[in-house]
């Protein structure tokens, strides 16, 4: 049995307040407790999973939607919309080397902000050896200026504390 250390007579006498007992035996409540203040990542090709995921998470939880190789950035839009409609916060991965051109990026940002209510994006280089368009890395995407004028309120950047196999340490 679980005992709350804050509910001991000594703590009660000293004015310490007790804490709530964990949600034992309720998977949805346990999952919500574990991710409180956290985030989750889901595949962009599974918009139908958004409602099931939302049933396990607190409303407004950030859900990062990946941008996989061989897929267009616009292919992530149905999942971003489904995440927003499920009451969660959609956060797209934007992989610079996978973007064909400025028009593709501009169309995506306009629709992501307008249709899915995207406020934040994670800017990545992408693991391709060669860029398919003008953006060699996340920094080039940021310098381009469309992110700043898109309506996004925040961007996230990856960190590689142990290094990255395709990025020289000096660049990191």
Stretches found by the model and what they are:
Residues 27-172:
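Active-site beta->alpha loop and helix N-cap motifs at the rims of alpha/beta catalytic domains
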Residues 12-13, 23:
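Ala/Thr-enriched low-complexity intrinsically disordered regions
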Residues 15-16, 26:
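Compositionally biased non-globular segments, especially hydrophobic aliphatic-rich helices
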Residues 7-8, 15:
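Intrinsically disordered, low-complexity segments enriched in small polar residues
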């Amino acid at each position: 049995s679980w005992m709350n250390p804050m509910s001991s007579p000594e703590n009660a006498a000293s004015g310490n307040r007790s804490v709530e007992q964990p949600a034992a035996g309720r998977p949805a409540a346990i999952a919500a407790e574990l991710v409180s203040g956290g985030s989750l990542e889901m595949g962009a090709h599974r918009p139908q999973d958004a409602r099931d995921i939302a049933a396990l998470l607190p409303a407004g939880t950030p859900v990062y939607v990946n941008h996989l190789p061989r897929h267009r950035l616009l292919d992530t839009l149905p999942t971003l919309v489904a995440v927003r409609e499920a009451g969660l916060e959609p956060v797209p991965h934007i992989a610079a080397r996978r973007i064909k051109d400025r028009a593709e990026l501009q169309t995506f940002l306009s629709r992501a902000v307008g249709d899915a209510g995207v406020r934040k994006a994670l800017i990545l280089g992408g693991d391709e050896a060669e860029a398919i368009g003008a953006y060699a890395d996340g920094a080039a995407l940021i310098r381009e200026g469309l992110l700043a004028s898109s309506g996004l309120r925040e961007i996230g950047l990856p960190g590689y504390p142990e290094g990255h196999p395709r990025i020289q340490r000096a660049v990191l």
